[in-house]
Every structure is written in structure tokens, then in C-alpha cells.
Design a protein with these regions (language model features):
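A residue-level marker of the well-folded mature domains of exported/periplasmic proteins
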Residues: 1-286
Length: 286
């Protein structure tokens, strides 16, 4: 599968198949033009649930869900206000706050960078949380921000990360899909740190990727399928955040020995304060 979120969703799908005994089928559309076609084709099969991954499906699903009121749908990363649609969203700003704390405390230059894919409201959540976390941990830090305009242009990601590094950023966080692989490549080639996103990307450059802001699309997919099996599906919006393990940091598999315990403790402290409500991370979508 070409997309990080799709790959994570597939894990959740296979988990549901194994543990819940459901039959599953899936397709990864080649382009936006195919999305409505696939949604309608699956609805025509009379499936118990049709799940679409990503905000780019939203406009098509508004139309399709209205045309198939007897079919249950779910969408990841956007909201469709329809009685037969369950919207699965994440508190990406909260998870990004945690990796921002890490970056703010680990930076030796007091400059860190953020590279986004498309400049859309969803990716603003990552940017906002990261900047707030970095400045919470280190009020003197400066956050450099650039958008690539694409989720599939590693060359542009590499170019922007190198530019930020040349301007002083020694840690760069990406929320850029496939474009982000260029950010990680640039970090390896130029000797600065990167922070991955969505899945655990630490393996892509052990010791260079400090951590990843993990977003458990697999968990969301599994849970919505389970609710169908259990007969508890209610539609509406379901949000996954730090408290329920929907977002968070990766396990620092390759970097735990490089990161001071005081920094790891600060991340845990921030996590606890977000859960308790003592820290409220800004959500640009609200």
C-alpha cells in the first residue's frame, strides 16, 4: 500500500478479520476520480460497513452516503454529518505537542522545523500542536514552517528540510505523507534529526529519527468494525487522543539511550497534563 494511513488501516482490517471473524475486502484507489466509484461499488454489494481513509474521500462520501441510507459508512480523518456515517478523527495536535516537547528540549540551536504536505486544516493541527509543545518546553525556541503542497513529493520534502537546516533547525518534524521520506533522507544526509509521523518511522533511519508521532488508524478501524459486530455502532463523531492511545510517541526503540531521562520524563509529564486537562492544546479546527 502506497500511503501510511492506508497501511495502518489495513493492519486494523486484518486484525478484525483474525479476531472478530469478519470477511473483508479492500481497494486502494489510484486517484481521486476513482473514489466515488469504489464507494458506490462497495455499497452496491450490501456490505455491513464501508470504511474510507482520508479527508480526500469526504466530498464523495457526502453524496454516496445520502444515496445509500441503508449502508453504514465510516470515514477516517474527516467528518460527514450523516446518520449512517461514523467519523473517526484523531487529536493530532495532542500527539504533536508531545513530539514538540521533545524537539524543544533536544534542540541545540533553539530552532526546529515543521514540514507539512498540503496546507489543509488537518495538517494545521500537527503544526499547531508541535509549535505549542516546543515553546511550552523551551520558550526560546523558534519554529520554522514550510508546506510542500503535496503528500507525494519526496524531492520537495528533502529540499524544504535542507533549507530549514541551513537556517538553523537541527530537528525537523514532518506531517507530509510520502513527501516526508525526503525529510528523513535529508536528515540522514545532512546530520540533523527528524521526527516521523502517523506510523513508527524510526526504522527508516535508526538514530536519526528521534521518534514518530504515531496515529493509530489501525485502532480506529478495528474499533468501528467491532462496534458493527457488537451491534453498538451509533454513527456520529468518534475521537481518538492521547488518553485512549489513539495518538502518541513511538517507543524510542533506536534513540532511548540518546535522549536524557529528564526529556523522557518531560514528555510523560506533558502527556499526563493533557489527559488531566491542565494543558489544553489548541485545535485550529475548533
Amino acid at each position: 500500500l502506497r500511503d501510511i494511513a492506508n497501511s495502518s488501516a489495513y493492519v486494523g482490517l486484518m486484525d478484525a478479520k483474525e479476531k472478530l471473524g469478519v470477511e473483508v475486502i479492500y481497494v486502494e484507489p489510484a486517484d481521486i476520480a476513482e473514489m466515488e466509484e469504489h464507494q458506490r461499488a462497495y455499497a452496491d454489494l450490501g456490505l455491513d460497513l464501508v470504511i474510507v481513509i482520508g479527508f480526500i474521500h469526504q466530498s464523495a462520501l457526502v453524496e454516496v452516503s445520502a444515496d445509500y441510507p441503508h449502508i453504514n459508512f465510516a470515514i477516517v480523518d474527516d467528518v460527514v454529518d450523516s446518520p449512517n456515517v461514523t467519523s473517526l478523527v484523531f487529536e493530532e495536535h495532542e500527539g504533536s505537542f508531545l513530539v514538540g516537547v521533545l524537539a524543544g528540549l533536544m534542540s541545540e540551536t533553539n530552532k526546529v522545523g515543521f514540514v507539512g504536505g498540503m496546507e489543509v486544516p488537518l495538517i494545521r493541527k500537527f503544526e499547531t500542536g508541535f509549535a505549542e509543545g516546543a515553546k511550552y518546553a523551551n520558550p526560546d525556541v523558534e519554529v520554522l514552517v514550510n508546506y510542500a503542497g503535496s503528500f507525494g513529493d519526496p524531492g520537495r520534502g528533502r529540499e524544504l528540510a535542507v533549507s530549514q537546516n541551513e537556517r538553523g533547525a537541527d530537528i525537523v518534524y514532518h506531517a507530509a505523507g510520502g513527501t516526508g521520506s525526503g525529510v528523513i533522507d535529508a536528515a540522514v544526509a545532512n546530520g540533523f534529526y527528524a521526527i516521523g509521523v502517523d506510523s513508527d518511522q524510526d526504522y527508516m533511519a535508526p538514530g536519526t529519527v528521534l521518534t514518530s508521532m504515531v496515529k493509530r488508524v489501525d485502532l480506529a478501524v478495528y474499533e468501528v468494525i467491532k462496534s458493527v459486530v457488537d451491534g453498538t455502532l451509533e454513527g456520529g463523531v468518534r475521537s481518538f487522543g492521547i488518553e485512549d492511545g489513539g495518538v502518541g510517541t513511538s517507543e524510542f526503540t533506536h534513540t532511548k539511550d540518546m535522549i536524557p531521562q529528564s526529556v523522557l520524563d518531560a514528555i510523560e509529564d506533558a502527556k499526563a497534563k493533557i489527559i488531566s486537562g491542565e494543558i489544553v492544546v489548541s485545535n485550529p479546527l475548533q
